[in-house]
Amino acid sequence: MIQPQTLLNVADNSGARELMCIRIIGAGNPRYAHIGDVIVAVIKEAVPNMPLERSEVIRAVIVRTCKELKRNNGIIIRYDDNAAVVIDQEGNPKGTRVFGAIPRELRQFNFTKIVSLAPEVL
């Protein structure tokens, strides 16, 4: 469960290392973001000499949360960190690689490009 002011790791090679959530995008006024939700975030830490810089406002999709994800078949998935992938306005990832395991549910939210870049899909 990601809420505003939550710090997240970045799971791609876009140039950002750490993000802070400032808004959750969705119908109504969602209080928490879960896996597959799009957020507006600010870059808190970035790699030098990369296109993304510190204090830049970007969009990202949540790919891992410490809060467990329950599937319909009874399986519960829990990750060790909160992580996101930086995306553009069309929903395509800005990086060319994705690090770490990615849940299968992202395919249902039309983030197939992120799923195809991932080394492991749970």
UniProtKB/Swiss-Prot annotation:
SUPFAM superfamilies attached to this UniProt entry: Ribosomal protein L14
GO cellular component: chloroplast; cytosolic large ribosomal subunit
GO biological process: translation
Keyword terms, alphabetized: Chloroplast, Plastid, Ribonucleoprotein, Ribosomal protein, RNA-binding, rRNA-binding
UniProt entry tagged with the keyword Chloroplast: yes
Gene3D superfamilies: Ribosomal protein L14
Location relative to the cell: Plastid, Chloroplast
Assigned protein family: Belongs to the universal ribosomal protein uL14 family.
Biological role stated in the UniProt entry: Binds to 23S rRNA.
Protein name, per record: Large ribosomal subunit protein uL14c
Organism, scientific name: Dioscorea elephantipes (Elephant's foot yam)
